[in-house]
């Protein structure tokens, strides 16, 4: 018996020992792996604003009033801008066109057909002033809405932001060219199909070999909540971020991480509102849900600036998404910070 059992014990001991070694190695590697993921995905440059918000400056107060005026015109006077209310889609495009022309821009429309109707993307361009004028910084926002929703936050707030950024830069050429583009057909049933306005635009840009060095999708930037528990996230982002919805979010896919870092560093250097950023795989829910996705498909670096919409806003895609729900003071702080981002991105390298 003894001579039989000893070899069995000798065979078992090494296996047990190596199993323990493997477990110890795994236990040491996992924290390192989580640290690397945190450094690559969650850690952002600069210091986010914290504490009590300072009073708006006179310029920010004027910006606040203008933002509210645009949102009330689009989501109040015009209202729902979906396939079911096609005349309102046309009216919204005309409103955007009129504002841009009043700022001195030449407006270009990119028309396309979808579901037997004509839709258009509306574009204004601020030509660059240096040798890098062929390089483009593009600011985009969709002006349509979901059905049965007036779309104050989603996305009259984003349209208002881009219109006011166009005002800021109207007489201030940068080294790189800056484009302000307003997309049709971001919402269902168009998302995510070839009939999205941004898909038409991004594919045409690639066909022309446009050198878009940065695309910023301004998507739902008007709603904030300082109550604990007001903010949710998709997994695994819920493991790394706070549950108070008082911040503006900036997200990208992994390929656009360098642009994300540059943008959020510039934003934090100026803005008086908290920020959080994430460079996450495109499969994470919410990360790709807007027009920046169209530019990713064409190989362009693109990020989304958002209040996180359905992960915070209780009136998302409902008839209650009305102008009275938004915080125009905080929205003005966001747009003011974005102006600083654009200046940094559009300067000569």
Where on the chain are the PLM-derived regions?
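N-terminal Sec-pathway targeting helices
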Residues: 11-33
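A non-catalytic alpha/beta surface segment that caps or lines the substrate-entry region
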Residues: 27, 58, 69-129, 276-278
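Proline/glycine-enriched tight loop/beta-turn segments at coil->beta junctions
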Residues: 129-136
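Extracytoplasmic/secreted proteins, especially bacterial periplasmic and envelope-associated proteins
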Residues: 66-69, 73, 87, 91-102, ...
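Structural recognition of the beta-strand scaffold that forms the well-ordered cores
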Residues: 123, 137-140, 179-182, 213-218, ...
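Acidic/histidine-rich catalytic neighborhood of metal-dependent amide-processing enzymes
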Residues: 146-255, 284-287
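N-terminal capping segment at the start of a domain
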Residues: 40-88, 103, 144, 314-321
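Active-site-adjacent substrate-binding region
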Residues: 225-349
């Amino acid at each position: 018996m003894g001579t039989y059992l000893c070899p069995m014990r000798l065979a078992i001991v090494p296996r047990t020992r190596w199993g323990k070694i493997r477990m110890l190695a795994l236990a040491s590697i996992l924290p390192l792996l989580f640290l690397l993921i945190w450094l690559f995905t969650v850690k952002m440059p600069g210091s986010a604003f914290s504490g009590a918000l300072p009073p708006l400056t006179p310029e920010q107060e004027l910006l606040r009033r203008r933002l509210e005026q645009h949102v009330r015109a689009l989501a109040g006077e015009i209202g729902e801008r979906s396939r079911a209310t096609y005349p309102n889609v046309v009216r919204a495009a005309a409103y955007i066109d009129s504002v841009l022309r009043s700022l001195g821009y030449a407006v270009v429309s990119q028309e396309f057909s979808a579901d037997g109707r004509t839709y258009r993307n509306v574009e204004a361009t601020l030509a660059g002033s240096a040798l890098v004028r062929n390089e483009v910084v593009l600011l985009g926002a969709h002006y349509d809405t979901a059905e049965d929703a007036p779309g104050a936050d989603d996305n009259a707030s984003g349209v208002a932001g881009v219109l006011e950024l166009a005002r800021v830069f109207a007489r201030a050429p940068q080294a790189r060219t800056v484009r302000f583009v307003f997309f049709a057909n971001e919402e269902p049933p168009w998302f995510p199909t070839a009939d999205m306005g941004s898909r038409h635009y991004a594919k045409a840009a690639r066909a022309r070999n446009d050198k878009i060095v940065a695309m910023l999708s301004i998507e739902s930037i008007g709603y904030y909540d300082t109550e604990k528990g007001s903010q949710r996230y998709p997994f695994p982002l819920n493991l790394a971020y706070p549950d108070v919805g008082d911040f503006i979010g900036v997200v990208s896919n992994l390929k656009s991480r360098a642009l994300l870092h540059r943008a959020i560093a510039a934003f934090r250097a100026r803005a008086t509102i908290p920020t959080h950023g994430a460079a996450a795989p495109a499969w994470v829910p919410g990360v790709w849900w807007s027009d920046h996705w169209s530019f990713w498909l064409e190989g362009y670096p693109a990020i989304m600036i958002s209040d996180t919409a359905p992960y915070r806003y209780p009136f998302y895609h409902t008839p209650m998404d009305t102008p009275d729900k938004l915080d125009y003071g905080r929205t003005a702080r966001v747009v003011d910070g974005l102006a600083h981002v654009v200046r940094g991105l559009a300067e000569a390298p």
